[in-house]
Amino acid sequence: MGKVHGSLARAGKVKSQTPKVEKQEKPKQPKGRAYKRLLYVRRFVNVTNMVGGKRRMNPSS
């Protein structure tokens, strides 16, 4: 058997420490063809270019 990193007594420590956040109610995502259309619009129609004309998948900054 392989070596285990740390004792199994500490298993799940981080998960038990994180505060529980309730799921939020969101509008439903389109399915199938409509979802593909949404992706197309997001990627190619509302183009957000970076410096040098590059596109980024997650242009938050």
Curated annotation (Swiss-Prot):
The molecular function terms of the Gene Ontology recorded here are: structural constituent of ribosome
Q: Just give the chief location class.
A: cytoplasm
List, alphabetically, the Pfam families matched.
Ribosomal_S30
Compartment annotation: Cytoplasm; Nucleus
Positions of disulphide bridges: none
UniProt key word Ribosomal protein = yes
Instruction: Give the highest taxon in the source lineage.
Output: Eukaryota
Supply the alphabetized keyword list: Cytoplasm, Nucleus, Ribonucleoprotein, Ribosomal protein
Return the annotated region ranges for Disordered: 1-36
Q: Which GO BP terms sit in this record?
A: cytoplasmic translation
GO CC terms: cytosol; cytosolic small ribosomal subunit; nucleus
UniProt similarity note: Belongs to the eukaryotic ribosomal protein eS30 family.
Q: What does this protein do?
A: Component of the ribosome, a large ribonucleoprotein complex responsible for the synthesis of proteins in the cell. The small ribosomal subunit (SSU) binds messenger RNAs (mRNAs) and translates the encoded message by selecting cognate aminoacyl-transfer RNA (tRNA) molecules. The large subunit (LSU) contains the ribosomal catalytic site termed the peptidyl transferase center (PTC), which catalyzes the formation of peptide bonds, thereby polymerizing the amino acids delivered by tRNAs into a polypeptide chain.
Known partners and oligomeric status = Component of the small ribosomal subunit (SSU). Mature yeast ribosomes consist of a small (40S) and a large (60S) subunit. The 40S small subunit contains 1 molecule of ribosomal RNA (18S rRNA) and at least 33 different proteins. The large 60S subunit contains 3 rRNA molecules (25S, 5.8S and 5S rRNA) and at least 46 different proteins.
Name the PANTHER family on file: 40S RIBOSOMAL PROTEIN S30/UBIQUITIN-LIKE PROTEIN FUBI, RIBOSOMAL PROTEIN S30, ISOFORM A
The miscellaneous comment for this protein is: There are 2 genes for eS30 in S.pombe.
**Stated name of the protein:** Small ribosomal subunit protein eS30A
Name the source organism: Schizosaccharomyces pombe (strain 972 / ATCC 24843) (Fission yeast)
